[in-house]
Amino acid sequence: MLEKIKQSAEYIASKVEDMPKTAVILGTGLGELVNHIEITETIPYSEIPNFPVSTVEGHSGKLIFGKLGNKRVMAMQGRFHYYEGYNMQLVTFPVRVMKQLGINTLFVSNAAGAMNPTFKVGDLMIITDHINLFPDHPLRGKNYDELGPRFPNMSEPYSKRLIAKAKQIAKDNDIRLVEGVYVGTQGPTFETPAEYRYFYRIGGDAVGMSTVPEVIVARHSGMEVFGMSVVTDLGVEGVVENVSHEEVQKAAAKAQPIMTFIMKELINQFEEM
């Protein structure tokens, strides 16, 4: 595994002149961010040794490098999901490669169904914490000390300073933001009404099929993380909607400009560690 990470990182480094310290995983709701990047390099996943390839509609597969406002960033266009059949090592492989390349801060986004009755479709939720309900764990198996500790501390999975900064940006621009706990499940089925009730009762506010494995590996590697969900459907008791992938994409597209604005401002304003 270490050899594969190094191989991928060396290939990417050979193609990129000025390696950034900040990376963004362009999940649902953030695809438009790429239009704000002054692109200097683009590398398709298919060209990178050992890299998996995304199979999901709406997730194209390439690494993009360039300037977002005043900051150099790496953007991952197209992520890998456990439900696609990848094992956890492959789902999180790009995050390992990011760390090898010197990335210190990771920004992630996703689409989520909300169980919290105060949330509305189109809301943006800052992820303050998560509940991991995936059936496998990205750190299961042999631990390599050079990648991170055997038993990582998860008391602050999402950076409090970045959360505070994002809330300030929203307040200054009169943008409605909610915050809450993201429940990560394997998918690919959307949730049943009973599952929504269960997730809410155990402390979840929104649920989705990504993000948690990447965040675990990023924190294991010592990266600072900020995450945001766009609420694309409701699983509130008595209001469970009939949801489809198309509906999710439609709701995400509507919320995209606001999420893009917040992420762009946040990435430009935060101090790199």
Language model region names:
Residues 1-154:
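Metabolite-binding pocket within alpha/beta catalytic cores that recognizes anionic/polar moieties
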Residues 169-205:
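Active-site/ligand-binding-proximal alpha/beta "capping" segment
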Residues 104-105, 205, 224:
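Short acidic/polar active-site loop segments enriched in Thr and Asp
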Residues 99-102, 200, 219:
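Non-catalytic positions within long, well-ordered alpha-helices that form the structural scaffold/packing
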Residues 143-182:
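Metal-dependent peptidase/peptidase-like ectodomains
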Residues 11, 15, 161, 165-176, ...:
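Generic non-transmembrane alpha-helical segments
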Residues 236-273:
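His/Asp/Glu-rich mid-to-C-terminal helical/loop segments that flank catalytic regions of hydrolases
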Residues 209-247:
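Zn-dependent metallopeptidase/amidohydrolase metal-coordination segment
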